[in-house]
Regions:
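Solvent-exposed, polar/charged alpha-helical surfaces in well-ordered, non-transmembrane soluble domains
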Residues: 10, 100-108, 112-116, 164, ...
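A short, glycine/acidic-enriched catalytic loop
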Residues: 86-97, 188-215, 220
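Short, well-structured alpha-helical segments in soluble
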Residues: 162-177
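Active-site-adjacent mobile loop/cap segments within catalytic or ligand-binding domains
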Residues: 173, 188-191, 200-203, 227-293
């Protein structure tokens, strides 16, 4: 409707009057308030609390991350031999104990422990079928691969293959993780009458490798004192120019888990809870080394 002369209102005409807008101070957005608004509007993604690793087997494939004690750490877990090479062979009655099968089972248990502590873990030697096994006598096979690649029969080629795989992964991992370590797990074979313990070998060229081996040994020594006080621990630490220790780029340790041909050490291997204990202690050794960086 139109207004009258002098912008006056006319009688009998209905007018729509808009509401009065209240004047207030201009809205000022500071960096702090913007950040506050962003933080309250969008939650940060939570730390990964569960992982899936089919290599552990159907029952144990889902891994709950229960701690962040090894967050920021990356590991390369390598079980010895595998594929066409069973490694050392022990015997209990009619059963053959193949080194590669027992080393692999302990390696899987260690890898799972490390994942539970928040670490990134690469399992270098793999068997798509085995998983973590609670059998005393582990069935033997030649299925193992080096992360999917067939394992060569030639020893030097076999060792170089796993070092190449570790080094390729490490070149990328070292940009993301402040602590990268490799472990090579074996089961020593000596004459049947000689009982052995757990032995740790380090690179002669790396001070960090020696520190890691000593911290592993200290961990095992304290565990033996607690769980087997009457037996004592006679394992040692020594430097070795082993092929994998000289050619793997990340700091590494080489572990011999007893004597597969000795009846007492065989118990350490065939009893599943003992294999788990070895894996637990290896993990605690890594934890001690990580804290002492």
């Amino acid at each position: 409707a139109k207004l009258g002369k002098g912008q006056t209102l006319k009688l009998g005409v209905t007018y729509l009057i808009p509401p009065v807008k209240k004047k207030g101070p201009a809205s000022v957005t500071t960096a702090g308030s913007a950040a506050k608004k962003e933080n309250t509007g969008k939650k940060q993604p939570p730390r990964k609390t569960e992982r899936n690793e089919p290599l552990f087997g159907k029952l144990l494939a889902n891994v709950k991350v229960t701690s962040n004690r090894l967050a920021g750490a990356c590991f390369y877990v390598v079980s010895g031999h595998g594929g066409p090479d069973p490694g050392a062979i022990g015997r209990v009655g009619k059963h053959e104990l193949h080194e590669d099968e027992y080393a692999y089972d302990i390696a899987l248990r260690l890898a799972r422990n490390l994942m539970q502590e928040g670490a990134e873990v690469h399992i270098i030697i793999q068997d798509a079928k085995d998983g973590i096994r609670d059998d005393a006598y582990l069935s033997n096979s030649k299925r193992e691969t080096c992360m999917g690649a067939p394992i060569p029969l030639n020893q030097v080629q076999r060792l170089q293959q796993r070092c190449d795989k570790i080094n390729a992964l490490y070149r990328n991992d070292r940009k993301k993780y402040k602590y990268c370590r490799a472990i090579f797990i074996h089961v020593d074979s000596r004459s049947k009458g000689k009982q052995t313990d757990v032995f740790f070998y380090h690179s002669n060229r790396r001070a960090e490798s020696k520190k890691l081996a000593n911290r592993m040994k200290d961990t095992f020594e304290s565990k033996y004192g607690k769980h087997q006080p009457n037996r004592g621990f006679t394992g040692t630490v020594s430097g070795r120019n082993l092929y994998v220790l000289t050619r793997a780029i990340p700091v590494s340790v080489f572990v011999e888990l007893g004597n597969i041909q000795n009846s007492l050490d065989q118990k350490r291997l065939v009893i599943p809870s003992n294999r788990q204990a070895l894996a637990n202690w290896l993990m605690e050794g890594f934890l001690k080394d990580y804290k002492g960086m």
